[in-house]
Regions:
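Conserved short histidine dyad/triad with adjacent acidic residue
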Residues: 36-51
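Structural motif
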Residues: 64-66, 73, 89, 99
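Short acidic-glycine-tyrosine-enriched beta hairpin
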Residues: 71-86
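Ligand-binding loop in jelly-roll beta-barrel domains
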Residues: 86-112
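A short, N-terminal "cap"/entry segment at the start of jelly-roll beta-barrel domains
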Residues: 1-32, 47, 114-126
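Histidine-centered metal-chelating micro-motifs
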Residues: 45-47, 66, 82, 86-92
Length: 126
């Protein structure tokens, strides 16, 4: 069994957010999916972007966000799951007073050349 702790995850600092690369081809050898824990500071967001050939699922753990997918906006809070279809454009803003935290799962895993916000360099696990 392969596991990874949040404290040990590769961390990407964006403007107003932190992305923890949890399960992916490099960390656990996954072939069909990758996942992240994402933290967004109050008032900050993640700009609109696409995930190329990947389908995405988001599950909100803490906080509130305004999420826009292909021009449709929704308010999400803890316990909400969001589906992002293949080829869709997504952006979000933390509209709560505290940190927004969510899990993002993508299938298939994508390379950084497709989505610099969340991609990885596809390589074999060490």
């Amino acid at each position: 069994m392969k596991t990874i702790q949040l404290a040990d995850a590769e961390k990407l600092e964006g403007t107003g957010y932190t992305l923890y690369r949890m399960l992916n081809p490099a960390t656990v050898g996954s072939k069909k999916f990758m996942s992240f824990v994402v933290e967004v500071h109050p008032g900050s967001g993640i700009p609109e972007h696409t995930h190329g050939p990947a389908e995405v699922g988001l599950h909100v753990l803490d906080g509130e966000a305004s999420v826009t997918i292909d021009g449709q906006e929704a308010l999400v809070k803890p316990g909400t799951a969001v589906h992002v279809p293949i080829g869709s454009t997504i952006g979000l803003t933390n509209v709560g007073e505290g940190a927004l935290r969510f899990i993002a799962a993508l299938s298939p895993p994508i390379d950084v050349s497709i989505c610099p916000v969340c991609g990885i360099e596809i390589r074999e696990p060490e």
